């Protein structure tokens, strides 16, 4: 028997206008998925001709029945069958494509659509041998869904439908006999009395009562009523996403998902609201939008009274109150209440960041993060607060800001009763009480309460400093550091001391400065009891007790406990004195030395004694002076036990003993 090339008609299912109108939304969606997948599989097998009209219509989201009679009979080279294509009549059974003797069908599934049966031949491993000495060909791992149906009359699907019309034939009285739709005939469910247009719908409905779910997933045990549902579900386990966007490379499990996504690139919004002329990418978005005009919000939460337009969002919201988190990450065990949150979370483990900013090269895990980031380059802040006019790059920032005006904080901590505007803020806060630090550094094992803090910490190991100052080129690990640094270039010092009039760039500098006037030293050493104005000074002091001197000078080998001391010491070798006095021209290696020197010219004496009112340029001079009032003499001679208020006095005294 001669080999014949398989045409597009061999793998298509046709409907007349009347038949198409009988299908419900789910069945039309199934038809669209199957047809598009058939066509894509044929293309992958070598077809390079023009695209059939029916495929074009399906891709555009239009109804295919108009072009059903125009389906091309064009032949597709590279794919062979053992039978020539035949015109199909309404009274003849549709036959299978039969393969050569060595053919093995690993798996066969049947998809039903209003009584029509789609034969789904999976992974056909066939070897075709031509009559004229052609080499063996193997077609493996190809998924081809054929319109042909097995002639095996014992197949259980024949109980629903034994024959199907060719699309060139209109629906007639024989349609009922074939399991098709006849709008005049109603089928009643004996269990609940529900009425259906056809046997197929009734059969599907009855599975609700019987609980029949014959298709089981071997991976997770989940069961489905139909094989095509199982097929789609299995892609979640395999990770298979056969539909790829040509623009950005993003892949999808279903073709309709790709179709919706592509509208983002084209900018097409074909679904328009007749009330306000607003356009949308999908019909679902339009349907949701219409409820704004109708005011229909049918799903109300009994816990908090919040209302929702869609039951899907309502069910997601309910999980906040119940605490149910059905979506668990297999990598780290973290659970989520929403499937989309799990999908986003999993990208953390893969490390994939497919969305790159063309301006600065920064990459992101999610497309909307990139969209938000782009606004920083464009300077756009589209989200404006109607109360105060403040604008934001990100909608979430605006939502957080609004809580300032409303003052509503519905989420309260059960331990300390502190209230928060957002549940996420409460979750983070609760870690203070529990001590939970879920984000651990793999390099050093240090753990953190916040992921953002871990990200900043990891840059210590990698050395990455992504934030660069455009003025001087200096780079920083943390965004807040560059924000502070930028104020150096502006020379703006908005924070002024009421006592002495000194101004500061940052509020915390002013806070520390005010302790000089108040004498407050909140940071105390547990070893020796010495107290400090600044936390940093205490940290440096603690190194004296530990004996740790991690900063070594490569020039002379001298070690230092403080980085600042080490930096200043290095200037001895380099001789660099970058800080010059504008009054007298004297230069200094440290900026602090220049500031102290400038007090000679200005006459500034910020350190005042509370006992007698005497003022000093240096804090150390005030400390020495206060010993006159207290009588404290901390410097004692080890030879004669005489004590002194100042170290310089002890130094001079020791010369009398020839100690120095």
UniProtKB/Swiss-Prot annotation:
Gene Ontology molecular function terms on file: DNA-binding transcription factor activity, RNA polymerase II-specific; mRNA regulatory element binding translation repressor activity; RNA polymerase II cis-regulatory region sequence-specific DNA binding; zinc ion binding
Intracellular or extracellular location(s): Nucleus
Residue ranges of every copy of the KRAB domain listed in the record: 6-77
Keyword check for Zinc: yes
InterPro entries (alphabetical): C2H2-ZF_domain, KRAB, KRAB_dom_sf, Znf_C2H2_sf, Znf_C2H2_type
UniProt keyword list: DNA-binding, Isopeptide bond, Metal-binding, Nucleus, Repeat, Repressor, Transcription, Transcription regulation, Ubl conjugation, Zinc, Zinc-finger
Record SMART domains: KRAB (SM00349), ZnF_C2H2 (SM00355)
Start-end of C2H2-type zinc fingers: 187-209, 215-237, 243-265, 271-293, 299-321, 327-349, 355-377, 383-405, 411-433, 439-461, 467-489, 495-517, 523-545, 551-573, 579-601, 607-629, 635-657
Protein's UniProt keywords contain Repeat: yes
GO annotation, biological process: negative regulation of DNA-templated transcription
UniProt-listed Gene3D superfamilies: 6.10.140.140, Classic Zinc Finger
UniProt-listed Pfam families: KRAB, zf-C2H2, zf-C2H2_6
Cross-link (Glycyl lysine isopeptide (Lys-Gly) (interchain with G-Cter in SUMO2)): 109
GO-annotated cellular components: cytosol; nucleoplasm
Assembly notes: May interact with MVP.
Recorded family membership: Belongs to the krueppel C2H2-type zinc-finger protein family.
PANTHER family, alphabetized: FINGER PUTATIVE TRANSCRIPTION FACTOR FAMILY-RELATED, ZINC FINGER PROTEIN 519
Function: May act as a transcriptional repressor.
Name assigned to this protein: Zinc finger protein 540
